[in-house]
A protein has these predicted regions:
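A short helix->loop->beta-strand "cap" motif at the edges of active sites that frequently abuts
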Residues: 123, 181-183, 252-258
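Rossmann-like adenosine-cofactor binding region
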Residues: 197-274
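Glycine-rich phosphate/diphosphate-binding loop of Rossmann-like nucleotide-binding domains
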Residues: 52-64, 147-221
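Adenosine-phosphate binding glycine-rich loop
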Residues: 256-257, 262-309
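Phosphate/diphosphate ligand-binding glycine-rich loop within oxidoreductases
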Residues: 36-144, 267
Length: 309
């Protein structure tokens, strides 16, 4: 059983914890595919979704996951809350805790914000993305999708291409995949590669062709213009021509390879429309995996809370 109150990142998660989450998520996904969307496990619980950044997939996915498990949900947008009046994250957390929330699901532009909140509250805190730091549930849903397709993570060759420097997804994927025994290759323009990423277990490649060759999974990452200054690459068109994944590049991957992207996708930039719409694409399946993974996490964290350990 997972022995933690919160899910803040995969940097400190064990392989055993990740595997337990994926096992539980696989069961949740089977139920969803059967049309079962009402479970009693979190009856009487309340989950507050506290987002300081915009989101469609993650916010909706967490809300559905909580409701499918029987919990009540509250959505708080920072722009329309007391945060807009200057309330600090710590004080917001204390307020939500005083209302006896069971879960606080937070997305924040500052790296480390979920850790600060978790130290303040009794509720379980789930990191839905903190700055350029981590996005653990996205990595878990990525691994859930991979494992469903290949039956394992160990030994898989995963190519990650795109804006690695500004991507919290890339870091969480790297932590999780390497802990479960996958080989991770990365490629991006030099201006979009963070210093030291190779020391975390990634193999940096000199070309997109080198990264994709023989890969079981080809993952594109969104160019995050909102987190960077101009000048990291000449233009989106030139990025697509020299760094994006098209059908010719994809043909270098394993014959059974799948294509993934955390979304939202810039069609024709990170991936061409032909690649996105190819039968190898698992982008829509990732969305369903996201609901299943978040259902699993809420369930497992509540089990630990109930144990009183």
């Amino acid at each position: 059983m997972i022995k933690r109150k919160d899910m803040l990142g995969l940097i400190d998660a064990t392989a055993e914890e990740i595997s337990e989450i994926l096992d539980t998520a696989a069961n949740m996904k089977k139920l969803l595919k059967q049309g079962i969307k009402k479970l009693p496990h979190l009856g009487g619980c309340t989950a507050t979704i506290l987002f300081y950044e915009n989101s469609t997939r993650t916010r909706t996915s967490f809300e559905l996951a909580a409701k499918y498990m029987g919990a009540s949900t509250i959505n708080i947008a920072a722009s329309s809350s007391s945060v807009a009046k200057g309330e600090t994250l710590v004080d917001t957390g204390k307020t939500l805790d005083a209302m006896k929330n069971d879960f606080i699901i937070i997305r924040h532009p500052m790296g480390g914000a979920p850790y600060l909140l978790a130290k303040t509250v009794k509720a379980s805190v789930l990191n839905a993305g903190d700055g350029m730091n981590e996005h653990p549930t996205q990595a878990l849903l990525d691994m859930c999708t991979m494992r469903e397709r290949f039956g394992k993570i160990e030994g898989l060759k995963v190519a990650i291409l795109g804006d690695i420097k500004h991507s919290r997804v890339a870091k969480s994927d790297l932590f999780g995949l390497t802990k479960l025994g996958a080989e991770v290759k990365m490629f991006a323009p030099e201006t979009l590669i963070p210093k030291g990423i190779d020391r975390l277990g990634a193999k940096l490649c000199a070309s997109r062709e080198e990264a994709v060759e023989g890969a079981d999974v080809v993952m594109g990452l969104r160019i995050q213009l909102e987190r960077q200054q101009a000048g990291n690459f000449p233009s989106l068109n030139e990025y697509a021509e020299f760094y994006g994944v098209n059908e010719k590049v994809l043909s270098l991957a394993s014959p059974d390879a799948i294509v993934m992207h955390p979304g939202p996708v810039n069609r024709g930039v990170e991936l061409t429309s032909a690649v996105i719409d190819d039968g190898k694409s698992r982008i829509e399946d990732q969305v369903l995996s996201g609901v299943a993974v978040r259902m699993a996490l809420l369930f497992l964290l509540e089990q630990f809370r109930k144990s009183g350990k």
